[in-house]
């Protein structure tokens, strides 16, 4: 019989996929609570790039920081009313978000070139088969597996922190609140960053949630024992100006609101995802050092110009 034909040569290997920027998926994921963005980094297959995305996630402003930013822009930087003022305020907010994205990408690049070196990987995002969603099952899984899970982490830190804030606001040494004494202690550090001790203390005590930073400031300025709310931006601006706020103060508060340590829920989520105290500390220190550097530069420039 004739000899069998030679086996066909194997097909050439497919070309390697072009490396993509998987870290960008964490940028929009941090606009809701940053904890959601940290959990969303699970889709990144490369452990190195997943870690970079987790570490830089807090540089993206979560929804808890937007009320403070909008109030500051409206009170100190928008000088006209009507559609022109609204457009100017929106442009300033967009500029701050672009700044956050730029800093996030810059820090990611820095981490990739230093402590987390490696070869960029490709991102393959598989699409599941399309089918009609089961609304009831989606709601149940969302509430049980996600909403209650994140809220449980928040309560474990927020409840003790709320008790600490209440004690500091209601316990007094003589006629002075403990809250005010701590603010006076932090005054030199706050002035170095273009703020004051009350603002710096509010950010520290706002660790459970970024939404309570501004109410803590007002509570300390007014020497109240509970969180307070001022009706109207005009009244709020008058109160802040009476306590020494300037354009430099507002700019530094806006920058530090963008770049400071993540909230308690995000910090706990980072630890759960990385299982490392070292990387959790890096995730806290990276945005904090960024904010301290920017605020110190703005404050120094303001003093140099005599503003």
Question: Residues of each region from the PLM?
Answer:
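Selected transmembrane alpha-helices and immediately adjacent juxtamembrane segments
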Residues: 1, 5-8, 89-203, 281-307
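Alpha-helix capping and helix-loop boundary segments enriched in small/acidic/polar residues
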Residues: 26, 46, 60, 85-86, ...
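Transmembrane helix-loop junctions at the membrane interface of multipass transporters and ion channels
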Residues: 42-45, 59, 66-91, 265-276, ...
